[in-house]
Amino acid sequence: MNLTPKEIVKFLDDYVIGQKKAKKIIAIALRNRYRRMQLSPELQDDIVPKNILMIGSTGVGKTEIARRLAKMMGFPFIKIEASKYTEVGFVGRDVESMVRDLTNAALNLVKNEQREKNKDKINEFIENKILEKLLPPLPKGISDEKQEEYKNSLEKMRTKLRNGDLDESTIEIEISQNMFDTNPNLPPEMGAMQDIVKVIGVGSKKVKKEMKIKDAKNALKNEAGEKILDQESIKSEALKRSENEGIIFIDEIDKIAVSSGNSNRQDPSKEGVQRDLLPIVEGSNVQTKIGTLKTDHILFIAAGAFHLSKPSDLIPELQGRFPLRVELDSLDDKAFYEILTRPKNSLLKQYSQLLKTENLELDFDNEAIKEIAKIASRANEEMQDIGARRLHTVIEKLLEDLSFEADEYAGKKFVVDKKMVEEKLGDIIENKDLARYIL
């Protein structure tokens, strides 16, 4: 999607309140990707993305900015936590696995696009598979009259199938089952082995299962995709997108910084993780199940609160790989008010729509919204600052009884006013010990 930086920021304004500096820097970084692709291949190789370091408390919009943009522009995107990785040689996930996770995200993205483009062919394949079970093909040498009868019956059955009239009927189908797919605890590094066993036919078998037709349609989608879609071109496109459009969001990078003021270094592998991360961010080749991926042009966005450490506590080489730094603003009551009123799918709209399913019309008057914003802001000041996430706990507590008794208000309109907010939350916010547990 070809958007100017201003258009990108305008899009983000619908979902993330404030944080103009962060939006501007990320918008420029994404636009530079488009600019790079317009250049000659020789120049493209030399121009590397300027990675970004976002500094700010939890809940101020760091992840949301990157995730919204990646989704809108159709870029492969993953969010990982730096603290979950271990130095090579230690038990745990190594940093290269984040690149493999990115290729998996790209693979799913491209597969879904191809499935959408070829949905008519895929649906036809699924229909034919199901119709074969409902109306087995005629043997050879049957008269023309019988063939015509069969053809008419087949079309009638096809119409019923498309209309959903047969959804509750039960059929027996054969589906492929991979022994690796049945174990959710296998690490992603097993991807290469899964590909090998698929090629040689070990570990995969056809199993017969009885199920309703509506379930059979979903079960046959993967098989249809494997048969109809060009798997090699999908892998090639996924690899290309990972390299040129991939975004890896590294959260909690402050957790692997070794604080200069902390003489008791409890985790000596922190610096090791940084050193393992360095070649990935600098640009290196990583083996994935879809091929060798060059990380030179992946955009890395690192983020952290840096309460107990500073960006300068990261090793100098890694600091140099994140030249763009932006500090995100903490959220006050005015920002909370905007968060509750401005976004397309604001929190209040979400709760209103949820209760609408119970035939209850929920509304908030303006003074009530201001009071909610004040209480959330105060809770963040007096307790740990968790940013906009505080609004979730505040509103949940406010609407707890109403959500529980929603059926009693069916067909009515319920307006939340300032008085109700004060009654439900006033005593709690005044009692700091109680507030720590509830809000």
Curated annotation (Swiss-Prot):
Cellular component GO terms, alphabetical: HslUV protease complex
Single Gene Ontology MF annotation: ATP hydrolysis activity
Binding site for ATP: I17, G59, V60, G61, K62, T63, E64, D251, E317, R389
Superkingdom: Bacteria
Annotated keywords: ATP-binding, Chaperone, Cytoplasm, Nucleotide-binding, Stress response
Pfam families referenced in this protein's UniProt entry, alphabetically: AAA (PF00004), AAA_2 (PF07724)
Localization (cell): Cytoplasm
GO BP annotations, alphabetical order: protein unfolding; proteolysis involved in protein catabolic process
Quaternary organization: A double ring-shaped homohexamer of HslV is capped on each side by a ring-shaped HslU homohexamer. The assembly of the HslU/HslV complex is dependent on binding of ATP.
Family membership: Belongs to the ClpX chaperone family. HslU subfamily.
Entry function: ATPase subunit of a proteasome-like degradation complex; this subunit has chaperone activity. The binding of ATP and its subsequent hydrolysis by HslU are essential for unfolding of protein substrates subsequently hydrolyzed by HslV. HslU recognizes the N-terminal part of its protein substrates and unfolds these before they are guided to HslV for hydrolysis.
Protein name (record): ATP-dependent protease ATPase subunit HslU
Species per Swiss-Prot/TrEMBL record: Campylobacter jejuni subsp. doylei (strain ATCC BAA-1458 / RM4099 / 269.97)
